[in-house]
């Protein structure tokens, strides 16, 4: 019985630990701390971009702008706004998102056409909430400690209960071998008054025991004869 309890408590401890760790991980991922970096040109109007030069002069500029830069640590997402004032208004109100890979510089494609510029960019930094993880870990440790203390208490209490049960338990033996319980001490008058009754009861018990022995002997003899 004690081994079964230990196994059940061990399984409960493992389940509590796994549930606590997974819940902490999911909570840290679903509740990230978002920090925003304000841009200097967020509230100001976008500066006019000079008209594109000749294709020959635009080629080195396009190469210079499209050169690979170091990847920023955060993902910057904004709405594209065309800087050229002469463009169609339908293009400037586009709701497609672009990714700002670096500084807000005018970019040109291979054909010398201007690319949309992200006027307002917000950087979202995803970080784990360490406070929540600490709280969850502390709760899990408390639960495990309580279960361990309860398990040790039951382990210490189990031998005492077993001793008490063994002390109260009396093995059932054959009725023929059972000694007659000692009669409590009574007065001589009561003994003399009950002497006849006790003798009669004793004779009846002896007679009944003899009958039981004979019946058992006959049954055993018949059983051996049948075998």
UniProtKB/Swiss-Prot annotation:
<dbReference type="InterPro" id="IPR008853">
    <property type="entry name" value="TMEM9/TMEM9B"/>
</dbReference>
<feature type="transmembrane region" description="Helical">
    <location>
        <begin position="135"/>
        <end position="157"/>
    </location>
</feature>
<dbReference type="Pfam" id="PF05434">
    <property type="entry name" value="Tmemb_9"/>
</dbReference>
<keyword id="KW-0472">Membrane</keyword>
<feature type="transmembrane region" description="Helical">
    <location>
        <begin position="7"/>
        <end position="24"/>
    </location>
</feature>
<keyword id="KW-0812">Transmembrane</keyword>
<comment type="similarity">
    <text>Belongs to the TMEM9 family.</text>
</comment>
<dbReference type="GO" id="GO:0005765">
    <property type="term" value="C:lysosomal membrane"/>
</dbReference>
<keyword id="KW-1133">Transmembrane helix</keyword>
<protein>
    <recommendedName>
        <fullName>Uncharacterized protein CG1161</fullName>
    </recommendedName>
</protein>
């Amino acid at each position: 019985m004690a081994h079964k309890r230990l196994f059940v408590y061990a399984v409960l401890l493992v389940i509590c630990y796994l549930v606590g760790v997974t819940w902490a991980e999911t909570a840290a991922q679903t509740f990230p701390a978002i920090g925003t970096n304000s841009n200097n040109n967020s509230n100001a109007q976008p500066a006019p971009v000079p008209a594109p030069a000749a294709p020959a002069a635009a080629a080195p500029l396009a190469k210079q702008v499209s050169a690979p830069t170091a990847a920023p640590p955060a993902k910057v997402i904004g709405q594209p706004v065309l800087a050229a004032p002469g463009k169609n208004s339908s293009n400037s109100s586009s709701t497609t998102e672009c990714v700002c890979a670096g500084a807000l510089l005018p970019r040109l494609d291979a054909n010398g056409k201007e690319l949309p510029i992200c006027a307002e960019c917000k950087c979202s930094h995803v970080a784990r909430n360490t406070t929540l993880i600490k709280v969850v870990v502390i709760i899990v440790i408390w639960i495990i400690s309580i279960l361990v203390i309860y398990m040790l208490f039951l382990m210490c209490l189990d031998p005492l209960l077993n001793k008490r049960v063994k002390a109260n338990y009396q093995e059932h033996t054959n009725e023929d071998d059972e000694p007659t319980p000692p009669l409590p001490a009574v007065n001589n008058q009561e003994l003399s008054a009950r002497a006849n009754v006790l003798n009669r009861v004793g004779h009846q018990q002896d007679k009944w025991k003899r009958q039981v022995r004979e019946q058992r002997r006959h049954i055993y003899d018949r059983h051996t004869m049948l075998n």
